[in-house]
Amino acid sequence: MTAPYLASRPLSAARSRRLSRFPVRTDLLDLTVRGEQLQVTTPRGPLPLYRFTPLQAAVLCGERVPYAAEWPEHMKLFLYRYQPLPTLARVTGPHAAHLGTQPRDPHGLRPWDQCTYGGWPLYLFMHDQPGLAAGGEVTDLFELMLVGQPALPPSGVRGHGP
């Protein structure tokens, strides 16, 4: 079964080989909230969602955060453990209004459009398992996405910053 977000962009043979090295979750259904944590549901249970926290400082300073493929080689294995959350086909409930979509590099390892919440791009940690504690938090890098998290200001907004 092909995931709808991958079917919309044809994969070249080379890109298909690159993608096969990294598992891609295709069983994502809807959003849910557990406590204050935003999660995505799967047939086996919910998975926690994460945000990349350095993005806020980059946006406030007018800088661009590169895709993982553009990072130094020694950082890629760490970054590839986080999968950009694909745009979900249908989302219901009170938090659907905060969802958005951002395009990604169509030539990269993860070419699908990415789901955002309050402007924050959302990520899955590839080693998390439904029903178990979240394992992908890394202080000052990846934090659990909370429903009360202030929205990420658009790039170039005046009046924000350190």
Model-derived features: positions:
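Compact beta-sheet-dominated domain cores in extracellular/mature segments
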Residues: 1-162
